[in-house]
């Protein structure tokens, strides 16, 4: 359950963001995306009743295991990409993909959560608002350029892939200026214990040039992605509609 305090939703921009998040959640029907069941309103709070994922965050799972064996990482990555592809088919960009926003259910299947920074976009539309977590942000976003929401989600998925198989982040620094310079330059090293196929896929996703970065279909066609036969779930495409939310 997600609880939103109405007293903290004061500005019109905040109201718009919450309405958009709820509207997006109501559209989604996919095995690898968290399901919203009900919205309960009181005078002070909004309660979003969500699907229960009792396996915790992927972040904690990676920390517990130090790093994931590649066959297990492939399974998780397939599910992440399947979920992201479904979002993009609905013209939704997540913009805050990271292991903390990926939950595991009782069968250790991925559930993408937290659509607070998500947005809807038109075909070919470029976005301009920088958002998300710095370590997972794409170079074009942190340098203030207009960006393709699809490609920033792909970049973030590549950072997640690196974190799963390596056990640490490709770009990390306590000083954000230094961190951003590393991201913009694509300054990272892949350890020797990573397989050649995984290494190749990581390099193709973490390309600082979004026009040369692998897209979803190229990722799905890559040999590493297909080490284990992926279980494809297309999800349901539901038409967008407005969910009334009152903040008075």
Model regions and ranges:
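Structural helix C-cap motif within protein kinase domains
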Residues: 166-169
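Conserved short submotifs of the Hanks-type protein kinase catalytic core
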Residues: 44-57, 61
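Conserved N-lobe beta3->alphaC-helix segment of eukaryotic protein kinase catalytic domains
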Residues: 3-28
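C-terminal regulatory tails of eukaryotic serine/threonine kinases
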Residues: 211, 216-248
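Activation segment signature within eukaryotic-like protein kinase domains
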Residues: 76-77
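A short, aromatic-enriched beta-strand patch in the conserved N-lobe beta-sheet
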Residues: 38-39
